[in-house]
Design a protein with these regions (language model features):
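A short acidic (Asp/Glu
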Residues: 3-5, 60-63, 91-96, 122, ...
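Short amphipathic alpha-helical segments and helix-helix/interface helices
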Residues: 3, 37-38, 67-71, 99-101, ...
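A short helix->loop->beta-strand "cap" motif at the edges of active sites that frequently abuts
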Residues: 11, 76-80, 106
Length: 175
């Protein structure tokens, strides 16, 4: 839904797409396209590169090598790498890439949501992990919009958290 959201902006945003799927074999080939993608970034100079890891619908997790190369390239053009981690808590491998734990920095932002792992589908409750100057800019913009989900969804989520803590069903996500 990101292209639709961008279209509602100031009209100057353009969306560039770069596929990491071999469409003939329907195979995930992000690592094989790392160099090509980095060259694409340098050529087109996007302000934001948005990745999803793991992605939907394949559940593929981008490799550390791929993401590190993209971040290094984005830094060269003074852009931002944003990773949407909507499905991060649904990765059950014992070893995950280091970038799953990166703190935000001047060029890296992570988007988070509890709507997938917290049985809150459709509630759009989430947060951003970003440098302070990004958070401050977002607060300026958000100060004139609705800042939270509607009351019904807040109450439902509150009940879910309370019940899940009491019955221990939330523990698996916190370990």
């Amino acid at each position: 839904n990101y292209p639709e959201q961008l279209s509602r902006g100031n009209g100057v945003a353009s969306v560039l797409r770069f596929s990491v799927i071999d469409e003939d074999k329907w195979e995930y080939i992000a690592d094989q396209k790392t160099e090509e993608f980095c060259e694409y970034i340098l050529k087109n100079k996007p302000k934001i590169v948005l990745l999803v890891s793991p992605d939907n619908p394949t559940s593929k997790v981008l490799s550390q090598k791929f993401v590190q190369a993209v971040l290094d390239t984005v830094k060269k053009i003074d852009g931002y790498l944003i990773i949407d981690f909507a499905y991060k808590e649904l990765v059950y491998e014992k070893i995950v890439p280091d970038y799953f734990s990166w703190a935000p920095n001047e060029n890296f932002i992570s988007l988070r949501t509890n709507s997938k792992w917290c049985r809150s589908l459709g509630r759009r409750i989430g947060w951003i992990e970003a440098p302070e100057f990004i958070i401050e800019a977002m607060e300026d913009i958000q100060s004139c919009t609705i800042l939270s989900p509607d009351k019904l969804h807040q109450m439902a989520f509150g009940k879910f958290i309370t019940t899940s803590i009491e019955d221990g069903s939330l523990d698996v996500y916190l370990e």
